[in-house]
């Protein structure tokens, strides 16, 4: 069985400075389906996982760590897609003025963990990574 067959939906709540702006970004820019919401939070179907944006006066500071020659933002969250899903998502956001931190690239080329990856920020500065392994079976391989 594949990794995807074993997964339960993950829940992640993130701070946002402006809920209306965040809802527009996650729906219109990233194409996510909005679920329930109030005037303080909104949840989204993030590739089968529950992402909740909560209004907050305090947004976390970020650092970067070097990974395969790139400055990767910490903290960040994201999803592992198939190569086909990665390409489809990339084509969906291609003309949406996404604020890339790391433009779509191949990381660890020729190694066990070879993957397509991209990093971008939402309007509140939350860093998001979308990636796809050349071989999903190597997700946890070293």
Functional labels for PLM-detected ranges:
Residues 22-27, 93, 125:
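Conserved active-site tyrosine of GNAT-family acetyltransferases
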Residues 18-19, 82-85:
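Helix N-cap motif at beta-to-alpha junctions
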Residues 1-8, 33-83, 90-121, 133-142:
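Vicinal oxygen chelate
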Residues 127-130:
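Short glycine-/small-residue motifs
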